Amino acid sequence: MTNIRKSHPLMKIINHSFIDLPTPSNISSWWNFGSLLGICLILQIVTGLFLAMHYTADTTTAFSSVAHICRDVNYGWLIRYVHANGASMFFICLYVHVGRGIYYGSYMFTETWNMGVILLFSVMATAFMGYVLPWGQMSFWGATVITNLLSAIPYIGTSLVEWIWGGFSVDKATLTRFFAFHFILPFIITALTVVHLLFLHETGSNNPSGIDSDSDKIPFHPYYTIKDFMGFLFVFIILLTLVLFSPDLLGDPDNLYPANPLNTPPHIKPEWYFLFAYAILRSIPNKLGGVLALVLSIVILIIMPLLHTSKQRSMMFRPMSQCLFWILVANLLTLTWIGSQPVEHPYILIGQLSSMLYFTIILILMPLVSMMENKMLKW
């Protein structure tokens, strides 16, 4: 008799995706982050669902409804802080996942990669709208500043901003629609994730060496299920430590005050995971130029396959490219720090230099160094 997991229509799909999936035998722990993102997404949907049961999307009661969740709902404080810090874990996993894709040349699977970039945009949009919901000072002013950037679009900009706001400023209509979108987007992200996996399973996983691994595959279960479980354990411990010991560590103190349209905070900034893009936006004095640079800092990922000039796929055996990659990582950390600083000397100059270096490394230096390595290897 055939095993039910191989004959049942639904079980068969799960079996081919997570159990009998042929996987390269040499993939490292950097490949754990895909499954970690799946766990983060499930965690965010579950905690978000429970929060939505008690939250009210109204400017007069939003802030107090969040306070009510923390004070009066059973384990409401835990659900709220797991959701807030879970977003931070989500972005850490997301950035490592993208970084691994760049380092090992996973972007050569163009369909999977482009789907991933769309997913990145969707998660960023969801996180931004989620940050507005508690209706604290930084929620309100962050929403005002970021949505106002769209007014830089020629001709239709102002109308577009007012259309998004549902009025002439960020108000009740804005909060209501942001809540609606924040609720529905994670389910759209789940559907996009299925498509992302579908494309990945068409080609099979990449591996650290970057060479074809068809001759050396092992089943996903039990080898990689146990390895993924170890990753879950690590992330779970870090998340729980953060939630139970310093839940507000990554938040902004200004958000502990209710939104006040009459009082502008001295330094408006988004959540830490958007600071690198925010620093790039601020480094250009022109409003439209800044918005374009902000969008390009993420869109640039789509053209990664076109910038690949090396004869080798992975950076594993390319020390010069490795150096550039880690300079890029350091540069992104610098941009994150700059984004959290006020707009004054010397932060402005450091931000401008770092932004310029970011685009220079990706668009010019990486392709050039790859060509040099080809020459040195006489390829």
From Swiss-Prot:
Q: Where in the cell is it found?
A: Mitochondrion inner membrane
Q: How does it sit in the membrane?
A: Multi-pass membrane protein
Binding of heme b b566 occurs at 97, 196
Molecular function (GO) terms for this protein are: metal ion binding; ubiquinol-cytochrome-c reductase activity
Mind naming one GO cellular-component term on file for this protein? respiratory chain complex III
In terms of one coarse class, where is the protein primarily found?
mitochondrion
Disulfide bonds, paired cysteine numbers:
none
Co-factor binding comment: Binds 2 heme b groups non-covalently.
Q: Name the positions where heme b b562 binds.
A: 83, 182
Subunit structure comment from the entry: The cytochrome bc1 complex contains 11 subunits: 3 respiratory subunits (MT-CYB, CYC1 and UQCRFS1), 2 core proteins (UQCRC1 and UQCRC2) and 6 low-molecular weight proteins (UQCRH/QCR6, UQCRB/QCR7, UQCRQ/QCR8, UQCR10/QCR9, UQCR11/QCR10 and a cleavage product of UQCRFS1). This cytochrome bc1 complex then forms a dimer.
Any remaining note in the record? Heme 1 (or BL or b562) is low-potential and absorbs at about 562 nm, and heme 2 (or BH or b566) is high-potential and absorbs at about 566 nm.
> What name does the UniProt record give this protein?
Cytochrome b
Q: Which organism is it from?
A: Fukomys damarensis (Damaraland mole rat)
Taxonomically, what lineage is the organism?
Eukaryota, Metazoa, Chordata, Craniata, Vertebrata
Please name the gene that encodes this protein.
Answer: MT-CYB
